[in-house]
Regions:
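Conserved SAM-binding loop
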Residues: 118-119
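A short glycine-rich, Lys/Arg-flanked "PGG" loop and its adjoining helix->strand segment in the class I
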Residues: 206-218
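Conserved class I S-adenosyl-L-methionine
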Residues: 76-86
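A short acidic, Gly/Pro-enriched loop at the edge of an enzyme's catalytic core
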Residues: 179-187
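S-adenosyl-L-methionine
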Residues: 124-178
Length: 230
């Protein structure tokens, strides 16, 4: 039995049955249901009271607020890259909250299962997106109620559009091994640097930031605290 190697995509021989995907060790930080676990921890730290009833990632809110406060000092964020996007919750929220919204967003993760989850999350976000409160257009009046995604499934993505959701794409690959072919105005690296450090050491971190420098105008890094290394 073979399965692709996470780092390079080449098949690796195994002489035992493959375990279900949800039982595989997340050795690259590729946790399933990571944002659900992270949300539970955040609620616990607040004494059991959620900070945001809508569940929007607090890092996204901080980033959106920072961009708004410095709008006259930074260039417009048109292209966004999320390295180690997991199931893409922050990226999808950012695409919907930035004003003006980005024209292109790319999520990259080493885990193909998580990329599949991210694509499903994109369809779900599109299906559950509600019109603006002050909108009176015919399209707004016929929006898809949130409960319908459970009753009838998700809406198909539009066949052609220059805006959300068709401006969001996901790629399953090790970004450290790919070629730098595009320039981005914002790169997200959320809860990622620890795993690069663990697998590649100090030299790997330096190489990672070197690739970032080649690709970006602005970077948002989530710095891990010391207990996360233990």
């Amino acid at each position: 039995i073979t399965q692709p190697c996470r780092s390079h995509g080449s098949p690796v021989a195994r002489d035992w049955p493959l375990a279900p995907w949800f039982m595989e060790a997340p050795v690259y930080g590729n946790f399933r249901r990571y944002y659900g676990m992270r949300r539970a921890r955040a609620v616990g730290h607040e004494g059991g009271v959620a900070v945001r009833a809508d569940g929007v990632d607090e890092r996204v809110l901080a980033l959106v607020a920072w961009c708004k406060a410095h709008a006259t000092r930074i260039r417009r964020i048109e292209r966004v890259l999320d390295v180690g996007c997991n199931a893409a919750k922050p990226l999808l929220e950012l695409c919907q909250l930035l004003d003006p919204p980005p024209t292109q967003a790319v999520g990259v993760d080493i885990d193909a299962h998580l990329v599949a989850q991210a694509r499903s999350a994109l369809r779900r976000a599109w299906s559950q997106r509600q019109p603006a409160a002050d909108s009176t257009s015919i399209e707004a009046m016929h929006y898809f109620p949130t409960c319908f995604t459970s009753l009838m499934g998700q809406l198909p993505l539009p066949s052609s559009s220059a805006s959300f959701p068709t401006n969001v794409t996901f790629v399953a690959q090790d970004w450290m091994d790919g070629t730098v072919a595009a320039q981005y105005d914002l790169i997200l690296c959320l809860s990622l640097t620890k795993w690069i450090h663990l697998h590649h050491g100090d030299e790997g971190l330096v190489r990672f930031f070197g690739r970032i420098v080649q690709s970006l105008s602005l970077i948002h890094i989530s710095e891990p605290t010391r207990p996360l290394y233990i």
